């Protein structure tokens, strides 16, 4: 018999029904001869018409995804329970093993006896003297369930077939049950059993072939042989008290049954054999409420073996009276790539960090909106005086840096000696004195006051400037004036050019009074020097010995007293003395009146005169 089954399971292909049935008949003959005389074959009692099977066969069966699932063990009850078969069996794959005589001492959390599984009422446990099966599950806390009718069980449990299904069986190493001596060679080995038909008495009954949605069984190498009950759906048709028929054992060549991870029901994945090697099933998914006692086969699935029979689910799962305890979920296998994907998905998209560039806000439209804010209580004059800078008149609005750097050293040369020092010593002036006109009416102050329109009648009372450059034209000369504070453009009347041609050259210092300031715009301001404005000229050729008389200090009112002024002293000493005594001789009345007419003077100037001179 062992050789016959080895021939069947030598390859993983399916065989014809004739080869399979012949092997089963050979196995039955050996098993029946080895069993006691009073043991009978398991046969269902048909008490309901055939329509039940046909009705159930017409129900659609869902296909389930593949997964791993724990497999609790199944032991048949030791007594006949025809009328009390009301409790549903677990839809998970059960391992069948015979119960020992001391089955009454089994733990209620580890085993569900026949009375607990198949009886709706809490009846006493049948006698343990009968040899049978006990439903045993590693899942604890399973309560009583409502079982289907007896007729459904009779029709459904008539004949079962393991087709295209995989089963993972494990013998519990810590169980207290004792296998028969001839079947206890290796408790860890599992068998692959496929039932196409039962004994001749079962063939007379209506055949119900249930295609099992369990994973397909694949034989592998094993070290021993262990006959395992091949029926997964057992019908207990004997009455209470009658001797229970001994189950038929199908001795199969010892092989470890390996199942592919195919799910047979939603929420109940099968586990790989590694999970069963420890003897404790792990549940990787929530358990479904158990169906009827014959709900091992949930529905017909495609089979590789050509069998012709009614394919229908044995029974439909019913609502249980007690919910099944949800086992702990198994930790899923997480890879680094999966963690990165999940992290990237859950991560909130962030904008790339950019350096915050604060835009300059304008207080009002236009370029003036960017000017710094003027604090209250500060005058524009005080701000400008505190920060001296190059004047922004028309020709020198853009003052070159190289000129500014060179002018720092030239200030000491130009104003620390020569005509400028001579003027200060002759008049006794100190440009550091705030009351002195050298400070109050310096070039930078004149430019600022002209921009603020603070000059009375656009004229400067007293002023001392040095000629930096002079450009002669057909009518008047364009001059650049400077002092220690800055520079300013201006014009010199042609009369002065004719009379003081030799004195008016770069480096000469002019002492002026009542000079008119022409302001064509707020940024452009010009000095208009006429013969009436000139008080004295300090040229480079003049020295201390050139003066016949020491210079007299200037009176407080320079505008009214002209007798103390000494123009042209450096150029012509003799004439300087005469003009100092009588200035009216040098400047006639009619000539002075014409020089005061600024409008006529400005109208005579050409347009290109106000442009920047070519350097």
UniProtKB/Swiss-Prot annotation:
Residues 47-71, 232-241, 257-275 have a biased composition (Polar residues). The keyword Metal-binding does not apply. One of its GO terms (molecular function) is single-stranded DNA binding. GO terms for biological process: DNA synthesis involved in DNA repair; female gamete generation; interstrand cross-link repair; male gamete generation; recombinational repair. The modification Phosphoserine is found at residue 47. Residues 42-75, 213-326, 546-590 are annotated as: Disordered. This is Homologous recombination OB-fold protein. It comes from Mus musculus.
């Amino acid at each position: 018999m062992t050789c016959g089954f080895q021939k069947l399971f030598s390859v993983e292909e399916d065989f014809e029904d004739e080869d399979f049935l012949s092997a089963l008949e050979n196995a039955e003959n050996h098993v029946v001869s080895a069993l006691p005389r009073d043991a009978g074959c398991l046969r269902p009692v048909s008490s309901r018409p055939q329509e039940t099977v046909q009705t159930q066969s017409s129900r659609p069966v869902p296909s389930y995804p593949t997964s791993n699932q724990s497999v609790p063990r199944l032991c048949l009850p030791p007594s006949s329970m025809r009328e009390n078969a009301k409790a549903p069996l677990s839809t998970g794959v059960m391992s069948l093993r015979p119960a020992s005589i001391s089955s009454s001492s089994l733990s209620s959390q580890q085993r569900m006896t026949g009375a607990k599984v198949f009886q709706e009422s809490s009846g006493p446990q049948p006698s343990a003297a009968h040899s049978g099966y006990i439903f045993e599950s590693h899942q604890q806390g399973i309560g009583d369930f409502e079982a289907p009718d007896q007729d459904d069980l009779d029709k459904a449990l008539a004949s079962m077939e393991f087709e295209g299904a995989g089963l993972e069986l494990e013998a519990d190493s810590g169980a207290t049950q004792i296998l028969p001596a001839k079947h206890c060679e290796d408790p860890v080995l599992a068998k692959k059993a496929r039932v196409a038909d039962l004994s001749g008495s079962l063939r007379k009954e209506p055949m119900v072939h249930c295609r099992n949605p369990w994973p397909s069984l694949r034989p592998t190498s094993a070290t021993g042989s262990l006959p395992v009950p091949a029926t997964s759906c057992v019908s207990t048709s004997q009455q209470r008290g009658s001797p229970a028929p001994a189950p038929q054992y199908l001795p199969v060549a010892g092989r470890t049954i390996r199942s592919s991870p195919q799910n047979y029901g939603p929420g109940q994945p099968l586990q790989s054999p590694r999970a069963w090697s420890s003897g404790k099933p792990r549940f990787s998914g929530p358990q479904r409420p158990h169906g009827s006692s014959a709900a091992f086969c949930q529905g017909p699935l495609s089979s590789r073996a050509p069998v012709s029979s009614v394919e229908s689910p044995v029974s439909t799962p019913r609502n249980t009276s007690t919910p099944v305890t949800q086992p702990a979920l198994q930790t899923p296998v997480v890879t680094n790539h999966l963690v990165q994907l999940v992290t990237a998905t859950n991560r909130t998209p962030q904008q790339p960090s950019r350096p915050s560039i604060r835009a300059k806000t304008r207080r009002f439209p236009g370029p003036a909106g960017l000017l710094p804010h003027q604090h209250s209580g500060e005058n524009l004059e005080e701000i400008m005086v505190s920060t001296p800078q190059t004047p922004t008149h028309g020709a020198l609005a853009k003052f070159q840096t190289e000129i500014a750097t060179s002018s720092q050293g030239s200030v000491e040369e130009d104003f620390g000696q020569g005509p400028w020092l001579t003027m200060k010593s002759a008049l006794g002036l100190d440009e550091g004195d705030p009351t002195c006109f050298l400070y109050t009416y310096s070039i930078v102050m004149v430019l600022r006051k002209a921009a603020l329109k603070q000059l009375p009648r656009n004229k400067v009372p007293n002023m001392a400037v040095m000629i930096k450059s002079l450009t002669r034209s057909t009518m008047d000369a364009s001059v650049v004036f400077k002092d220690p504070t800055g520079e300013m453009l201006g014009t010199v009347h042609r009369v002065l050019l004719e009379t003081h041609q030799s004195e008016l050259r770069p480096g000469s210092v002019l002492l002026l009074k009542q000079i008119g300031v022409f302001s064509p715009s707020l940024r452009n301001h010009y000095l208009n020097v006429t013969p009436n404005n000139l008080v004295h000229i300090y040229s480079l050729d003049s020295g201390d010995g050139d003066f016949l008389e020491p210079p007299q200090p200037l009176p407080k009112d320079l505008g009214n007293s002209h007798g103390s002024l000494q123009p042209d002293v450096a150029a012509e000493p003799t004439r300087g003395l005469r003009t100092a005594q009588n200035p009216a001789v040098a400047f006639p009345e009619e000539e002075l009146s014409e020089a005061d007419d600024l409008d006529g003077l400005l109208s005579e100037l050409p347009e290109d005169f106000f442009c920047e001179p070519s350097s």
